A protein has these predicted regions:
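A short, conserved structural fragment
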Residues: 219-229
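C-terminal scaffold of the Radical SAM
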Residues: 1-205, 253-254
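Minor-groove-contacting beta-hairpin "wing" of winged helix-turn-helix DNA-binding domains
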Residues: 230-235
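Structural preference for long, well-ordered alpha-helical segments in enzyme cores
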Residues: 181-184, 214, 244
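Short amphipathic alpha-helical interaction segments
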Residues: 205-220
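Extended hydrophobic-aromatic, low-complexity segments
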Residues: 196-197, 209-210, 226
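Short, amphipathic alpha-helical interaction segments positioned at domain boundaries
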Residues: 236-255
Length: 255
């Protein structure tokens, strides 16, 4: 991955790489024969200008980066970050990028299969120090779904393997209710949205039955698309993803 911002905004977001560094890296990637790679753009820095953000995106596009991930810095100015994200949606779409997730943009044929698997709530096995794993049995849902993380220290990790003892730092079992909430949080970030039938089948949560009034209000405000089987955020709703998700999860009660 290549990460960067406009030269004039590097200090504003704490980025140590220059545009020249990024260009050299991309040339090396091309010479090595890679056609699938991703670049990162950082936004939300306290001193980052709108012009700088535009230049940062334009630079990545001009270098031919096929997949972009936007990283948000929470500096307290939510309005500024929303404005930058709104600009990115418009700008990158016009350049042929599809916003398949809130902060992941790809040209046709260049979506990250790993990211799509994550946002589909698929099982993941993480290997190495500090790696995180999520493992859920096949349908129907089971309380045996687990999430765990390995110890971050390399020495402790190796010693655990040598002693035939799993070097796990944290391990938790997830209830069906907790899984339903996670699935909602993940899917509401995606362009495809939250499949209400899948939510009911996988996690026994019938959201439309429980939150019909809330969904109706969100639809009237232009924050979600009208679809009897799916909740997908509009571009306006995407700028309020966290607030909409918190509202729906809060109204569901504790996990």
């Amino acid at each position: 991955e290549g990460r960067g911002v406009c030269e004039g905004d590097r200090a504003a977001v704490g980025d140590a790489h220059s545009d020249a560094d990024l260009a050299r890296s991309i040339r090396r990637v091309g010479r090595a024969g890679f056609r699938q790679f991703s670049g990162d753009r950082v936004f939300g820095g306290a001193g980052q200008s709108r012009a700088g953000w535009k230049a940062s995106l334009h630079r990545a596009v001009s270098l031919g980066v096929p997949h972009l991930t936007l990283h948000e810095l929470d500096t307290g100015d939510a309005e500024k970050r929303a404005d930058q994200l709104a600009f990115a949606l418009t700008f990158l779409r016009a350049k042929g990028y599809v916003p398949y997730e809130l902060t992941h943009f790809a040209r046709p044929g260049h979506r990250s299969l790993h990211q799509e698997h994550v946002y589909a709530h698929g099982s993941i096995l993480g290997l190495g120090p500090g790696a995180e794993s999520f493992w859920a049995p096949d349908l129907p849902p089971s309380p045996a779904a687990r999430r765990w993380s390995n110890v971050a220290d390399l020495t402790a990790y190796v010693e655990g393997l040598q002693a035939d003892a799993p070097p796990v730092a944290h391990d938790e079992t997830l209830s069906t209710s907790a899984l339903a909430r996670e699935y909602m949080l993940l899917r509401l970030r995606t362009q495809a949205g939250l499949d209400l039938n899948a939510l009911a089948d996988r996690y026994d949560l019938r959201l439309r039955d429980r939150k019909a009034d809330t969904l109706r209000r969100l639809r009237r405000r232009g924050l979600i698309h009208e679809d009897p089987d799916r909740v997908a955020l509009t571009d306006r709703g995407r700028l309020l993803t966290d607030a909409i998700t918190r509202r729906l999860l809060r109204e569901l009660g504790p996990a």
